[in-house]
Amino acid sequence: GNGTQQIFYRRDDVQYVSLHGDPARAYPYLSGFADETGAARGAGANSNLPLATGTDDEAYLTLLGVACEAIAAFGPSVVIVSLGVDTFHNDPISDLAVTTDGLRLQGELVAQLALPTVIVQEGGYDVDAIGDNVRAFLLGISVGSDPDRDS
């Protein structure tokens, strides 16, 4: 995440939006603050939405909705999701409270952007739950992109 932000920080042709643990208390500690909005031509194209301790599915989905609105307004031709499932409530490095079902709902919300979507799996350290959590997000993408399909 922080490396991705750095790559695009001065560009206006790529929008970077990130939901992640608050860097005041969570890795990487040095970047990802809400006031980091881009520089030079990229001013305003960078959005960090740090998550408070204990962020649950409802709070996460609310912020993801804000992110999706910003993405839709930007008008991209593709969305790239850096999927970190270290937001999971049992993840050993997490102080968040996202559930497996919440990850499915996140996928559904992202799919509603109705854009070609690339998903890159990044964080996640509860080795017993990573597969279920990634599968849940992908199921959400699948269901969300086909409104006639029932989960």
Annotated model-derived regions:
Residues 1-151:
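A general "terminal functional-core" signal
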